[in-house]
From Swiss-Prot:
<keyword id="KW-0963">Cytoplasm</keyword>
<keyword id="KW-0067">ATP-binding</keyword>
<comment type="function">
    <text>Catalyzes both the ATP-dependent activation of exogenously supplied lipoate to lipoyl-AMP and the transfer of the activated lipoyl onto the lipoyl domains of lipoate-dependent enzymes.</text>
</comment>
<comment type="subunit">
    <text>Monomer.</text>
</comment>
<comment type="pathway">
    <text>Protein modification; protein lipoylation via exogenous pathway; protein N(6)-(lipoyl)lysine from lipoate: step 2/2.</text>
</comment>
<dbReference type="InterPro" id="IPR004562">
    <property type="entry name" value="LipoylTrfase_LipoateP_Ligase"/>
</dbReference>
<protein>
    <recommendedName>
        <fullName>Lipoate-protein ligase A</fullName>
        <ecNumber>6.3.1.20</ecNumber>
    </recommendedName>
</protein>
<dbReference type="Pfam" id="PF10437">
    <property type="entry name" value="Lip_prot_lig_C"/>
</dbReference>
<dbReference type="InterPro" id="IPR045864">
    <property type="entry name" value="aa-tRNA-synth_II/BPL/LPL"/>
</dbReference>
<dbReference type="InterPro" id="IPR004143">
    <property type="entry name" value="BPL_LPL_catalytic"/>
</dbReference>
<dbReference type="InterPro" id="IPR019491">
    <property type="entry name" value="Lipoate_protein_ligase_C"/>
</dbReference>
<dbReference type="Pfam" id="PF21948">
    <property type="entry name" value="LplA-B_cat"/>
</dbReference>
<feature type="binding site">
    <location>
        <begin position="75"/>
        <end position="78"/>
    </location>
    <ligand>
        <name>ATP</name>
    </ligand>
</feature>
<feature type="domain" description="BPL/LPL catalytic">
    <location>
        <begin position="28"/>
        <end position="215"/>
    </location>
</feature>
<feature type="binding site">
    <location>
        <position position="133"/>
    </location>
    <ligand>
        <name>(R)-lipoate</name>
    </ligand>
</feature>
<feature type="binding site">
    <location>
        <position position="133"/>
    </location>
    <ligand>
        <name>ATP</name>
    </ligand>
</feature>
<keyword id="KW-0436">Ligase</keyword>
Length: 337
């Protein structure tokens, strides 16, 4: 049996691909594994990130962009079919992320592209305009195994990074960066005819060359669940609101708006995706419905639909304030996504 394993996904579903990755990682033996894949339009966040802070969730919902939480750390990234994704897995002591980084750099060299590793998890290219990032990575280790996964920007729609990601201004300032868009680059700028299949072939060849052996590719089809232990359960988890949103760290959120009938300040404390405390302050001449709303919100999931349902119930209880509460409902629907 080969010491290597190569898997290639034909699915563009981020939840499907991340479930495949997780199941392979759980069941892996002593083989060195390479998994190649890509996602349709998705924002992928790190295991411990807060999507409401990191992403423009309202814009994502409007545009049909999925949110996917991965099992590794690191920051939020936007994927489309202009990205190629790779995952290297190995048992310890054979796991070494510098080896997998070297394989990616060698693959790029085969394509005529000279890149270097920078910082903890980036691959960059030196240009006349400065250093440009073309790849980002994240890592995960357990006691006996580890994986390194990342993306390569081929011809991604870089303008959409700003549409869906909320970059931390302190992080940008600390790195001396003016914007996310200005520091990233597509590989197509350096090799105009580059394609996902070219990149996959180059990474595969560099993988085989490094270890001095080959393995037949296993194609993962989106039409049939792969023969992986507990895949259906893992796919259901990766697809769930509870995993992608509800696993966010505890946080607080303040919303405020001025309506014709009065100003409203709403304070939320959210844990595990559910509202655990709500306070509403208003100068409305009829505050009773809003005081009741604060009570009703406790225990609701932090989703616009759940808050809208509370408002619907409130309108039934306070029909004389239906116009004001309908306006409040619409505002909450637009503000919380």
């Amino acid at each position: 049996m080969s010491n290597l394993r190569l898997l290639i996904s034909d699915s563009y579903d981020p939840w499907f691909n991340l479930a495949v990755e997780e199941c392979i990682f759980r069941e892996m033996t002593t083989q060195k594994i390479l998994f190649l894949w890509r996602n349709a339009e998705t924002v992928v966040i790190g295991q411990s990130q807060n999507p409401w802070k990191e992403c423009n969730t309202r814009r994502m919902e409007q545009d049909g962009i999925r949110l996917a939480r991965r099992s590794s750390g690191g920051g939020a990234v936007f994927h489309d079919l202009g990205n190629s994704c790779f995952t290297f897995m190995a048992g310890k002591p054979g796991y070494d992320k510098t080896v997998s980084t070297g394989i990616i750099l060698q693959a790029l060299a085969q394509l005529g592209i000279t890149a270097t590793a920078s910082g903890r998890n980036d691959l960059v290219i030196d240009t006349a305009e400065g250093v440009r990032k073309i790849s980002g990575s994240a890592y995960r280790e357990t006691q006996d195994r580890g994986f390194h996964h990342g993306t390569l920007l081929l011809n991604a729609d870089l303008n959409r990074l700003a549409d869906y990601l909320n970059p931390d201004p302190k992080k940008l300032q600390a790195k001396g960066i003016t914007s996310v868009r200005s520091r990233v680059a597509n590989l197509a700028e350096f090799k105009a005819d580059i394609s996902h299949h070219q990149v996959c072939d180059a990474i595969t060849q560099a993988f085989f060359d490094h270890y001095g052996e080959m393995a037949k590719a296993e194609i993962i089809s989106p039409d049939v669940y792969p023969d992986l232990p507990d895949f259906a359960a893992q796919f259901a988890k990766q697809s769930s609101w509870q995993w992608n949103f509800g696993k966010a760290p505890a946080f607080s959120h303040l919303l405020n708006e001025r309506f014709v009938w009065g100003g409203v300040d709403i304070f939320f404390d959210v844990e595990k995706g559910a509202i655990c405390r709500a306070q509403i302050f208003t100068d409305s001449l009829s505050p009773a419905p809003l005081q009741r709303l604060a009570e009703m919100l406790v225990g609701c999931t932090y989703r616009s639909e759940a808050l809208a349902n509370c408002c619907d119930a409130l309108i039934v209880q306070y029909p004389e304030q239906a116009a004001e509460l309908t306006e409040l409902r619409q505002w909450l629907l637009e503000t919380i996504k």
